[in-house]
């Protein structure tokens, strides 16, 4: 049976140093992969490209921070992950193997089981007589499994912590500090790139489903009453095309996306926020710039039963790959005020933003007046506890209490008339609000795999990884025409050192025939080869070879840095850089 593309990439990955299973000498552990020298470079360049698209091009509104990998339990109780971050599992009663229940149902029956409840999955397994795919044993009951990696912080029992499953919570907890440091401006984007962990039940798709991986994520904080004003760069992408498969279209059985202009998608309510739509359009450009054609990208809207607990609307950004079909490479979510409101409630801290009015205005407000003297006289020793509890209450809670016939605080009934609602006039200079959040979140490792797959070519029996030039792990190779000529080697070494000092990632190769060396460079995606030949010794010129066309031009050795920079970063055509070399 012929190798499929995934198997070819796995072979190259191991042999040339892109990636391989972690802990191989101990048999490996599912869901963990190492990035080798070339894979690490490729991943780093993709991260830098993401930073360019999401941070640097929006740096007047977006900043980047770094937060801890481990967080205390109370953070993840507040975020809802302790309660909601679960997947359904089912165990074989014979061999003891554990499977993710919805995936087992999908693979056995060819249906979409995402979002089905535990009881629905259990019913399907019983009614359809599904058995263990490994030993054909009987399957047990479907249960839920929490995907958080649990740990202990310090030597203290009960000090529970979790490895972060996303970068978002570190950003939300740090929001107030960043907001104040950025002079209290909204909109505000806070980006972060870092490692996360999810204790996946049965990861079986190599780099596509890992237990530890890198995320590139941004939380974009906006004023919910000024959605358009919160996206000052919308015009940059207004005419961009978004291929969207809506939830309603999925329910009708449709599988192909419909193309929407960004502005059209927002105005028609397909995307509920211009900010959400804008970052989707940026995400489209980013993935295209990894070498993925637009017809292999789409956005799939998730239904209410499929969305995460914090989301009002979510679109998965999908890319079509050879082995698994459509896979998610990013999630775009409108998280509303869920996260900041939860952290305000559990921490007791004010995480609101303030928007000043053009000039102060006078407004009428209802206020609750607490008669502390009456409470003190009536409750005596218990008054202190009651007053402290009243001090922690918000205005809305106090108003509800004052309006009730029988007000009870800290288990004590308040004396009649001790809480009064009055109407007052106040001069206000602005309004406070809980910012809403739009989140683009990209799985770095999946995007690296996608870049590898779409770069793969076979040309005249040779493998070429035709990466976009600016993400190629190695940018150039320097080659003396022959390895045993001291003068050629000396000049080649000089060119190599010049490129290294100029900041390029470059390697030197003088082993084997020149054709074999070109092939080695093509196989790892090196976009440019600089060859030092006998003409170099005569007139000081070298050849610059294009990986994708195999054509060459002659340029001055003293021009190599400038010409290579234009070729790699500016997308210059080879023919515009020098004099063509006849084949």
Swiss-Prot record:
Leading EC class: ligase
Family: Belongs to the class-II aminoacyl-tRNA synthetase family.
PANTHER family linked to this entry: GLYCINE--TRNA LIGASE, GLYCYL-TRNA SYNTHETASE/DNA POLYMERASE SUBUNIT GAMMA-2
Chief place where the protein resides: cytoplasm
Keywords: Aminoacyl-tRNA synthetase, ATP-binding, Cytoplasm, Ligase, Nucleotide-binding, Protein biosynthesis
Binding, substrate: 100, 166, 213-217, 439-443
Coiled-coil ranges from the UniProt annotation: none
Gene Ontology BP term (one): glycyl-tRNA aminoacylation
Chain's role: Catalyzes the attachment of glycine to tRNA(Gly).
Cytoplasm among keywords: yes
Compartment annotation: Cytoplasm
Name of the protein: Glycine--tRNA ligase
Catalytic activity of the protein: tRNA(Gly) + glycine + ATP = glycyl-tRNA(Gly) + AMP + diphosphate
Organism: Aeropyrum pernix (strain ATCC 700893 / DSM 11879 / JCM 9820 / NBRC 100138 / K1)
Molecular function terms, GO-annotated: ATP binding; glycine-tRNA ligase activity; protein dimerization activity
Domain of life: Archaea
Residues given in the record as ATP binding sites: 198-200, 208-213, 328-329, 443-446
Protein's gene: glyS
The protein's Enzyme Commission number: 6.1.1.14
Entry GO CC: cytoplasm
